[in-house]
Amino acid sequence: MSESLHALARQLEQAIRASQPFQQLKQAYEDVRRDETAYQMFANFRDIQLRLHEKQMRGAAILPDEIEQAQKAMALAQQNAKLARLMALEQQMSMTIAEVQQIAMKPLEELHRSLMEEK
């Protein structure tokens, strides 16, 4: 049974890869990769984001100046048309995947709800 679920998951992966939103996102990444300025801004923003995430995962405090640095990098990145497009497309794709995840989790949620309703 789990093999069939994995097969369906692989089909979903292929459907995502073939979808227009994913293809647009892929093109946006390529556009950023080809633009040195946009690429450097993206790399800087991503580095800051990763450092903050690592600190958060370790339970370390994120300092106000680190938050400010991240906000400035984000604001700067959003001023670049290619990066702004990439971020918007990435957000749309994330929302779509979150919706798919909600659908996939529905059976578990129904089980939890039914358990609570029985008592």
Swiss-Prot record:
Residue ranges that the Swiss-Prot or TrEMBL entry lists as coiled coil: none
Pfam families attached to this UniProt entry: Com_YlbF
SUPFAM superfamilies: YheA/YmcA-like
Family listed: Belongs to the UPF0342 family.
HAMAP family the record matches: UPF0342
Protein name: UPF0342 protein GTNG_0551
Organism name: Geobacillus thermodenitrificans (strain NG80-2)
Organism taxonomic ancestry: Bacteria, Bacillati, Bacillota, Bacilli, Bacillales
